[in-house]
From Swiss-Prot:
Keyword match ATP-binding: no
One GO cellular component term: cytoplasm
Domain of life assignment: Bacteria
Pfam families: YbeY
One GO MF term attached to the UniProt entry: zinc ion binding
Name of protein: Endoribonuclease YbeY
Amino acid sequence: MSIEVVNESGFDGVNEEALIDVATFVLGEMDVHPDAEATISVVDVATMSDLHVRWMDLEGPTDVMSFPMDELTPGMGRPDAQPFGPAMLGDIILCPEFAAKQAAKAGHDMGHELALLTTHGCLHLLGYDHIEPEDEQEMFALQNELLQDWYTYCARRGVEFQPKPSNAGAFPSAADRAELDKLVPGGGIPAIGEPQ
């Protein structure tokens, strides 16, 4: 797996090695070809706000956006395609300043929040979304399972990027995350297509 991190945020405390590790783990667990590529861009609030308006027509910043290179169906790739081969999956955009605010409200550190958002972004690259309630429940359950498994994988290797949080907001359901989004001024992750 080739994961490139481009950090243009100017924000302290972003552990690029952790972002690469969690993305590599998640994509591997999802049976993505080991030669696949993805990019994680870490940006400032102004850049994220611009992208959010330009691509989602939503004002203000958000924590994560994903730009898949191809339209995939969860677990199967494109409906008309062969199984995943080596490919460029797409780009994940993270905003650590916004993520830090969410982490503080949720009661865990920014490192965990960025790992959660990277997992969320990887699932979007693979075709998962949260437009419909049943899809949202499936995506958030899978996100939490993968993130829990990543912490277990890190422990088995004797690696700790940040302590595994045990608070209720660390592995949120879709409903929990919606409540958190209301607490952080200026953004959040609305369900795709959700009226503002």
